[in-house]
């Protein structure tokens, strides 16, 4: 596990070879050498089960937890154009564990992140959390290598990932984690 805010430095100095963890390709197409996309993911919001927050518009004036340097952080800080209401406070955490602990303890009213990561945690305790039906953003996920490196490996990996999409492997894995296989593999429009 790496410190997510340090990911670019770790990649550029060779400490890590690639970034492969719910990493959005959207808006970063020219910043990295990409393999994929291997799946689609939505940015979603989770709240405590008893919360009065039912929709994105209910986030107005609320405290939001996000992981630092993520798409969710950019959305709530207004760095990416969105129709989100103005929130009271955006709290950025180094890890998803810290972000979800803040929700559990009531330090934030809601948390936002990639559907796969949020589902991983909320599915462990479905009686305590729920995910809003509306999504913040949809994106393609890929494997990022430092720009100008590993072009052959990225091409081979892209082909392998495409084969895994076609033969149903990625869909089966998605279902094991409580995700909609069709949307995860083929996006909102489906196959």
Q: Over which residues does each language-model region extend?
A:
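Periplasmic-binding protein-like
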Residues: 40-47, 72-76, 119, 123-177, 180-191
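Short helix-initiation/N-cap motifs at beta->coil->alpha
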Residues: 1-9, 51, 90-101, 105
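Short loop->beta-strand "edge-of-pocket" segments that line small-molecule binding or catalytic clefts
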Residues: 57-73, 88
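Ligand-binding cleft/hinge of the Venus flytrap
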Residues: 72-93, 122-126
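Acidic, polar ligand-binding/catalytic clefts
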Residues: 1-58, 135
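Hydrophobic residues within well-ordered alpha-helices
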Residues: 11-12, 59, 103-104, 143, ...
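A ligand-binding cleft/hinge motif common to bilobed small-molecule-binding domains
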Residues: 6, 22-31, 75-78, 104, ...
């Amino acid at each position: 596990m790496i410190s997510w805010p340090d990911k670019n430095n770790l990649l550029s100095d060779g400490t890590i070879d690639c970034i492969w963890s719910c990493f959005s390709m959207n808006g970063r197409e020219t910043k990295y050498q990409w393999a994929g996309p291997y799946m689609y993911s939505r940015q979603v919001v989770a709240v405590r089960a008893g919360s009065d927050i039912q929709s994105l518009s209910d986030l107005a004036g609320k405290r939001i937890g996000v992981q630092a340097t993520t798409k969710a952080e950019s959305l709530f800080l207004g760095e990416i154009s969105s129709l989100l209401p103005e929130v009271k406070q955006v709290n950025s955490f180094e890890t998803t564990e810290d972000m979800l602990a803040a929700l559990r303890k009531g330090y934030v009213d809601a948390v936002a992140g990639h559907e796969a990561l949020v589902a991983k945690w909320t599915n462990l305790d479905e009686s305590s959390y729920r995910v809003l039906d509306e999504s913040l953003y949809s994106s393609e996920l890929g494997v990022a290598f430092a720009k100008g490196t590993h072009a052959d490996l990225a091409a081979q990996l892209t082909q392998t990932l495409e084969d895994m999409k076609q033969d149903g492997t990625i869909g089966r894995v998605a279902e094991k984690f409580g995700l909609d296989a069709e949307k995860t593999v083929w996006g909102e429009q489906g196959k």
